[in-house]
């Protein structure tokens, strides 16, 4: 189903609903627009924290996985209208997984190395339950039943998949 975005471009929503939103068919900004949207704000540690600093902050109890997922979603919301870098979001699932990791950190269990870290996956990698289009409108309704090997390993290491990033059609 095509739905208009606030800027008048098209947005597609598949069977999984809004929690698995797809943002195909949007204009990509010029380098100047991209720079104004994100880089002019400065790429500070606060705006663009490293994976290591995020994991350390969670281990010290200064940040939660839920905080990091929400911050990631906010940053995507700020920059993506210009960048069109993220084409599918899995907000509800990511927040549910983040809450589970937050509980695990509180229990002080032995945790996997990426426990609670928000990540984005290229759209040419199958992600169970999250739309995988291969960058093609032909696959807008494809929701895999299994993860690709790399996604399976990331999840096993504790990563929280927030969404999928744009690629050229079929990665060509």
Regions found by a protein language model. Give the residues of each.
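An N-terminal boundary/leader segment
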Residues: 33-93
């Amino acid at each position: 189903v095509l739905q208009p975005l606030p800027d008048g471009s098209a947005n597609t929503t598949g069977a999984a609903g809004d929690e698995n939103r797809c943002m195909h068919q949007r204009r990509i900004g010029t380098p100047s627009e991209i720079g104004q949207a994100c880089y002019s704000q400065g790429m500070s540690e606060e705006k663009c924290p490293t994976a290591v600093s995020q994991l350390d902050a969670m281990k010290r109890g200064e940040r939660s996985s839920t905080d990091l997922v929400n911050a990631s979603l906010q940053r995507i919301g700020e920059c993506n209208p210009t960048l069109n870098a993220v084409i599918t979001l899995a907000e509800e699932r990511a927040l549910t997984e983040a809450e589970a990791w937050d509980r695990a950190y509180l229990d002080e269990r032995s945790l996997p190395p990426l426990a609670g870290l928000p990540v984005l996956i290229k759209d040419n990698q199958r992600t169970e339950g999250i739309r995988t289009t291969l960058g093609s409108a032909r696959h807008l309704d494809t929701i895999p039943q299994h993860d690709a090997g790399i996604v399976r390993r990331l999840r096993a290491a504790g990563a929280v998949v927030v969404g999928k990033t744009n690629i050229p059609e079929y990665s060509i």
